[in-house]
Amino acid sequence: MKVLEKELFGRKLRIEHGKVAKQSLGSVMLTFNESTILVTADASEETVKGQDFFPLTVEFQEKFYAVGKIPGGFIKREGKPSDEAILAARLIDRPIRPLFPENFFNEVQVITTVFSMLNGDSIETWGITGASLALNLSPIPFNGIVAGVRIGYVDGQFIAFPTQEQLKNSKIDMVVAGTKDAVTMVEGESLEVSEEEMVEALMFAQEKIKEIIAIEEEFLSELNIEKWEVQKEIVPEEFIEDYLSLIDEEELKKVLLTKGKKNRDKVISEYKKNVMKKFEEIFLEKWSVAFFEDKKRFLENAFEEKLQDSMRKMIINENKRVDGRTCDEIRDITCEVGLIPRVHGSALFTRGETQSLGTVTLGAPLDVQVLDTIFSDEEKRFMLHYNFPPFSTGEVKRLRGVSRREIGHGHLAERAHKNLIPSDEEFPYTIRVVSDILESNGSSSMASVCSASLALMDAGVPIQKHVAGIAMGLIFENDNFVVLTDILGMEDHLGDMDFKVAGTRDGITAFQMDVKTSQVNKEVLQKALEKAKIARLKILDKMYETIPQPRKELSPYVPIMKVFKIPVSKIGEVIGPGGKNIKEISELYNVEVYIEDDGKVKVTGHNANKVDEAINHIQNLIAQVEKGGIFEGTVKRVEKYGIFVEVLPGKVGMLHVSNLKDKLESFKIGDKVKVEVMKVEDQGKFQLKQLKEEN
């Protein structure tokens, strides 16, 4: 058993190994302040024969006992992971995945289990560090040490692992992961910060990552963990050389420069088949059919590497990309709004071969999403959901539930907008945006940011500014590097970086970066952010040309909502016993009534007259019956000594027989009678007298 305790960022960090989960290949218990996680790393000892991909699974297990809660719902136990848990798992997955050896294809599972959690301890960020420790404590091959840090920016000062209170006042909320040498993963949101502030934040994060890695190194020292050997299947170099000799550089370049994603993919596939066919014709006798069939995948990998090399050289040496653009060019953009009937707001944003349909639905306060996770139990009134159907890339796949990727992309686009959404006081509707990707060739999440902004303005949501997003790429070749603007899917796959940046004309609002190289330094980040700003401003110009400001009127299909206040002391009267009054009003007028703790009442419905009638009903419920008040009441009961008359909803007074103008026998339940209030007693009871109807 090994334990290490350190003071770090004003709180206590404790790392423990060898006490729990001892049958796991690698396990570590990590406690930061009042939050505790167990991270385990396990793997199969053998690779499935012929497997050529790395099956890594990262899970983040929420335990409600960690925050002293019992799960909601009927079953009362943890079920499928929440969106927040999936996002946490993705956050851990992204920085560790590139650090596994290239030829390691064993199945690996990393699980982070939360035992105790205090909001503000950023336990999901510590999951990155925990995963690094667990993998290094195991025999699983893993190249290096990685750590994660959360950064805030309050009053001009950067803060590592800000508290919940500090985050409320922070201009930046970002999670950064990296090695000792470089930042490898970034995710976060900000309040329109500048590119200079962003670079400073990343450099600050890198220094803090070094501090955490130093602690990891101290903990791992003297343990001498023996690692499994990566069973690399060897093929003769001559086998690969024979194959590569059949690929003509100029011909491959022409193939790469084929216009259009579908055409390019088709031409590349045909060229690859032709090269393989030539190889069989010329070299099959030399290598034998059995050897060729067994090792064919190595030739396919060699083709991919050659393709990657050719694309990268073309960019570095000729400033030319596979679709003919220069490195700084954005693909053609078209924007259209109001194209879908009946929806509350819609927009189609197309950038090259990537297309997003954004739609907005405005709902009642009761349409909010009620979160029930260990991270939050709040209500969410702005949601952005992202859908990526298989037809967007011309593929055939089963339509299952929402994928982790869809949750992650939607979350990023949502963060780009969330701090610019009007407050509940300014715009009381619940807002749901959906981005349906209709076509995809790179950066569909940033297209979603743009379509969402256009659709919000089309719906009449009073956002002050448009938000646009762009994805930047990077090609490193020896000591040279080139930053690419608006990357294609192929450039993302074969390049060294995917840096998504969203924002307004005034600054950055959301960002996400994944890096495959350790060469990303301050200079690279500055250049990428500068070019991202230039591109973002060009896209924003197009968007403002399409719709410069929110529409003045909402769609006729949007529910009508009216807001007013009642005294807090009257909330119970309006709700009624067991919600009786609210239910009655909702059914009577076909409306939804929502009452907040401060007495704010929101009434929504599709008929303006019914909404007004419901409001009048509520106001009558809380109206005071005063002496001298004259009402046209309804007879509710008839007794020998008089009748009981309802003058306002729920307000029934006694009209004694001595104060009747008409005979008692002439009254029946439901009759209308004009009355005046004679006396109001302390308990709220009141006495009436009948007034003669005027002819």
UniProtKB/Swiss-Prot annotation:
EC number: 2.7.7.8
Cofactor annotation: Mg(2+)
Catalyzed reactions per annotation: RNA(n+1) + phosphate = RNA(n) + a ribonucleoside 5'-diphosphate
Statement: the UniProt record of this protein carries the keyword Nucleotide-binding: no
Cellular component GO terms held in the UniProt record: cytosol
Recorded GO MF terms: 3'-5'-RNA exonuclease activity; magnesium ion binding; polyribonucleotide nucleotidyltransferase activity; RNA binding
Subcellular location field: Cytoplasm
Residues at which Mg(2+) binds: 492, 498
Residues in KH domain copies: 559-618
Gene3D superfamilies, A to Z: GHMP Kinase, N-terminal domain, K Homology domain, type 1, Nucleic acid-binding proteins
Keywords: Cytoplasm, Magnesium, Metal-binding, Nucleotidyltransferase, RNA-binding, Transferase
Primary subcellular site in the record, as a coarse category: cytoplasm
InterPro entries for this protein: ExoRNase_PH_dom1 (IPR001247), ExoRNase_PH_dom2 (IPR015847), ExoRNase_PH_dom2_sf (IPR036345), KH_dom (IPR004087), KH_dom_type_1 (IPR004088), KH_dom_type_1_sf (IPR036612), NA-bd_OB-fold (IPR012340), PNPase (IPR012162)
EC primary class: transferase
Protein's UniProt keywords contain Metal-binding: yes
Pfam families: KH_1, PNPase, RNase_PH, RNase_PH_C, S1
PANTHER family named among the record's database cross-references: POLYRIBONUCLEOTIDE NUCLEOTIDYLTRANSFERASE, POLYRIBONUCLEOTIDE NUCLEOTIDYLTRANSFERASE 1, MITOCHONDRIAL
Function: Involved in mRNA degradation. Catalyzes the phosphorolysis of single-stranded polyribonucleotides processively in the 3'- to 5'-direction.
Family of the protein in this entry: Belongs to the polyribonucleotide nucleotidyltransferase family.
UniProt-recorded name of the protein: Polyribonucleotide nucleotidyltransferase
Gene behind the chain: pnp
